[in-house]
């Protein structure tokens, strides 16, 4: 299922404290209490007004799909396994249609969204190397489940369930039912 296997790499977070620990002590102290599959790599003092999510200069999401003839047993926890044949060139062509500023309401899973659904995607790259498909999304921000739905839509283009010609109509409809899984 495309909905599992979610991971964060080099995620930025922030918190406020009155503690007088060094950055190294903050890192080491937090790591003592975290499970082994979650690690603080670095800590630094910031301006009091800094907010990791609100001050982000951009966001990057990656979907990794194991599409090889034989499942990758070593990386399986970090990939979704899909065995269909995908037309990567069609997916790349469709991805170009998402670049720029658009109303991505069709790609949002929040029916009660009160804020603007207009977002800007600066780049989408799709690569297939040795049966591993990576889809990278870069933008100024993303809606609830937007990247997941965009990925599903691109995969449907890759299996020819949708065509590139469908993408402008899906964007225009502003309906979650119009987009991919």
Question: Which residues are covered by each model-predicted region?
Answer:
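Active-site loops and adjacent core secondary-structure elements that bind or stabilize anionic groups
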Residues: 1
């Amino acid at each position: 299922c495309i909905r599992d296997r979610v991971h964060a790499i080099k995620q930025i977070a922030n918190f406020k404290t009155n503690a007088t620990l060094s950055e190294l002590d903050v890192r080491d102290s937090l790591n003592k209490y975290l499970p082994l599959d979650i690690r603080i790599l670095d800590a630094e003092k910031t301006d009091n007004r800094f907010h990791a999510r609100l001050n982000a200069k951009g966001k990057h999401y990656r979907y990794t799909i194991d599409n090889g003839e034989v499942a990758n047993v070593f990386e399986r926890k970090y990939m979704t396994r899909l065995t269909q044949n995908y037309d990567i060139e069609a997916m790349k062509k469709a991805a170009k249609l998402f670049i720029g500023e658009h109303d991505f309401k069709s790609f949002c899973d929040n029916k009660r969204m009160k804020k603007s659904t207009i977002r800007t995607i600066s780049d989408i790259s799709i690569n297939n190397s040795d049966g591993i498909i990576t889809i990278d999304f870069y933008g100024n921000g993303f809606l609830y489940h937007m990247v997941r739905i965009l990925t599903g839509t691109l995969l449907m283009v890759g299996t020819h369930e949708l065509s590139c010609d469908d993408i402008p109509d899906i964007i225009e409809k502003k309906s979650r039912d119009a987009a991919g899984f």
